[in-house]
């Protein structure tokens, strides 16, 4: 932000301490008014014709901006991504155990990446892996949405599940 003597414009549209528009005044007059109030002259929009400046306590303004930014960072929700690895030939009980883990992660609000690693000649039976992933998505459909459908990446096939949003929960 540009403030006080660093302002290059000869005239500025001045906004007073109380937020009321004073009008278009010379830079020197605006600086004098700011000095009389023992505050700073801050250039808000330098590209406007004439540029808009406001009389305010810049230190307090910067503190408020930092506080808002910190609050926004705190309110951001970081999505954890958990990974569950399966084999293309997984059987009943093992599948159920992995499904239980997927459900637990989804209820805690984490995204889940379900992956299948094809070893050796198993890569020739990609359809088996796809069936297992589709079955997993189907079984967890009451708690999740499919973000990415089963797709190959090197020797692995994966599927991404995200927990249902509040809107989606109401639909189901």
Curated annotation (Swiss-Prot):
Name the major location. Answer: cytoplasm
Q: Which GO terms describe its biological process?
A: ribosome disassembly
Domain of life of the native organism: Bacteria
Q: Name one GO molecular function term.
A: translation initiation factor activity
Q: Establish whether keyword Ribosomal protein is in the entry.
A: no
Question: Where in the cell does this protein reside?
Answer: Cytoplasm
Identify the Pfam families for this entry: IF3_C (PF00707), IF3_N (PF05198)
Alphabetically list the UniProt keywords: Cytoplasm, Initiation factor, Protein biosynthesis
This entry carries the following GO cellular component terms, namely: cytosol; membrane
**What family does the Swiss-Prot or TrEMBL record give for this protein?**
Belongs to the IF-3 family.
Q: Which HAMAP family match?
A: IF_3
- What is the role of this chain? IF-3 binds to the 30S ribosomal subunit and shifts the equilibrium between 70S ribosomes and their 50S and 30S subunits in favor of the free subunits, thus enhancing the availability of 30S subunits on which protein synthesis initiation begins.
Subunit: Monomer.
Name assigned to this protein: Translation initiation factor IF-3
Q: Which organism is it from?
A: Lactobacillus johnsonii (strain CNCM I-12250 / La1 / NCC 533)
Taxonomic classification, please?
Bacteria, Bacillati, Bacillota, Bacilli, Lactobacillales
What would be the name of the gene that encodes this protein? infC
